[in-house]
Amino acid sequence: LLNNDVKDAVMEITMTGPKMVFNVSTYLSITGADMSPTLNDNPINNYEVIKVQEGDILQFGKLKTGFRTYLAVKGGFRTAVKLGSRSFYKPITSLNCLKDGMEIEISEFQLFEPKITQMKSQSLHHFDEIIAYRGPEFSMLNKESVKKLKSQRFIVAKENNRMAYQFIETIEEHNYEMLTSATLPGTVQLTPSGKLIILMSDGQTTGGYPRILQLTKRGIAVLAQKRSGDSIAFKISN
């Protein structure tokens, strides 16, 4: 929508959105969860290019659908670059989120002719089926555990963040032992008590629990829009 570079930083907003005053003119676009955004108290839509003037106030209201919203401005947010990234991640960066009253640098754009001014919603909140592939230790599962994974719905527990998601439901307990091995975003680990832990974008890179499933990139994106109490089902692909 904004023709930004893939490395230009966006703002991820979880559950509750901020109130922002723009000190320069620019263009913005909002995707992901619908948090009832307004510009100068006038409702605006997700998945559109919005012209912003100096002094305009952007505010987010009630969360209608989804869990995470993404706000982009033309040219991206100019946060400090650490290890080739503008993301916040303690302890590599001093902050892990924005604080009230902070100022964030953006570039001024008076003129911009977008190739498209709006697009069909790409929101994933209404999907509840998550595609996953068999993980390296999938074969250690017994028939009952496999049956539960394929047929049971799993409710997102309160323990969920950018590092990992957990579910209320469990599968069979096990005593499988393995060496610490590599993990990726989307790796589904199984604890000895039968609890499933799905590593997310800021998840650890190694782990000692069996890696029974691996989510697709789309599966990770779908799960990231789920909040506590939402449910999902796995579709296990060969």
Where are these regions (language model features)?
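Conserved "landmark" site that anchors the functional core of diverse proteins
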Residues: 1-238
